[in-house]
Amino acid sequence: MGVWNGLYPSQAIFARRRFRRVLLNPPCFDPGSWCGAGKLWIDECDGEYWLTSRPRMGSEKRGYAVEIYRSRNGEDYSLVTWLTKEELSESIGKIVQSIENQQLVRDPLSGKYHLYLSIDIAERNVAGDERRIFESKWETFLLVADDPSGPWKPEGFVLRGDKDYDSGEARDCTIDIVDGRYICLYKARKAGTRVVHTALAVSSDGKNWMKLGIPTVDGEHQPEYFLLNGSIHAGSLGPIFMGTKTLDVVNGAALTRYFASYVIDYRSLNLETIFSAEWKPSSRYEHPQYPIHTYCNVVYDPISDRWLTWIEAVDPILSREPGLNTEVDRVLLYVSE
């Protein structure tokens, strides 16, 4: 796909991306209905593509389940299994108000699949109100299975809000395995504040995590709102993040205008910029000013020798306006060949 050394350049993936199709639609098209916030995992051996998603229907029926889809070509997906927040609440013994981001990886030692869920375990379901989103209590929970189709068994909380900087939110992870090491970039917010940063954690087994803290960006402190979401790849310079860079909150929703890539220097706790550019919509399904609602994946497809990028897109026609309970989100696929 190119003549460059090392990891295929994020600049080329970005420049060559072409809109392919809508992958998933929300459960309905009323404002406040979404799908997405998931993870694309490709099983090269079995020729299968697995995609997770969380459906949402407004402020009261927030992220009410995790859904797992399967495809044979990376473009046409069928629902295989799901787990509701009520079922999850029963299995972990704690009320789950909402499910958001999910991450799906396969553990190299056990061969089991790890499904990480961002769950709101606040005492009351108040964060559906755009004025009260910072009253939520988000942590990350792990489920384990022999196959992505389930059954999924609860393993326990793996990222708790036990640091000052993530006491309000420890969620919305980007988790991948590089050289046998789990690497995680996640959303960290101190309780009682509106300051959101991207934190870094590592693990040898995906269950016991070491939090390294809030990395600098090119040696400087992160902006007051700085959220990364995407994928982590093995590069010649070290682990490489590719995905969205979110700097804005619009009517309670973290909305994205930028695609970026960074070298993750976990030893020096720094993110070194490789590339950053404005994401300009190439489809009629993306809002012209805020095309993406935080979430995306950038994944190499070894089955078809191409790069797949999916985004959770803010629909410009069905949405009343960008915002927590006023927009409609779909999952879109871009292909770089």
Ranges and model annotations:
Residues 1-337:
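Carbohydrate-active catalytic/glycan-binding domains of CAZyme proteins
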